[in-house]
Amino acid sequence: MARSSSVRADASPFVPDSRALADLTAAVQACTACPLYIDTTQAVFGKGSAKPRLILVGEQPGDVEDRRGLPFVGPAGRVLWECVEAAGIDRNGLYATNAVKHFKHENRGKRRLHKKPAADEIEACHPWLDSELEAMPKVNIVALGATAARSVLGKPVSISAERRAPLKLGERTVFVTYHPSAVLRADDRAAEVRAALVADLAAAWAASRRPRSVKAGGG
């Protein structure tokens, strides 16, 4: 059952000891650490290579992702994969996930409109992201947007200030850039934001070319 609002929500009790991605994907469906699981179809875990060259972290699943159970399959996802292709990146070398695993939204008639996760919701869900990163040690990360950057780095981040300066996180390098939804919201700046996202993805991919010793996770 959901935690009382007087107690800080924490997904840690729901995360299994295993770092096998299949085990984590199954376990996340039982998570009720925060109220975001209410009125959603399912939790949406990461998808992609278990031994990637690069990890992409977004904010949260959207309406389409919640219904299909896969990350980045809605309008913003289409933009992301177009940018990945434009950057010359082999999609088979990627693992894509989100900082928050349930779709936060408000109902407007028959529509479900995205709502930005609050800081305590990002923190509550962080053990799930941590478990994914532990399954893929040393792999560089692209944080797509402010929510992803906050979850990965553990602090608020200005995208405009940090996107040209890769940050070290242990043995990883973190590249901060725009979320693909920013392209959809940019109106007359859409081409500029898209070009910046493509350039940042290409730079992250180029910096992650050397083969890494990566374990896929185990018991």
Where are these regions (language model features)?
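A polyanion-binding, active-site-adjacent surface
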Residues: 2-219
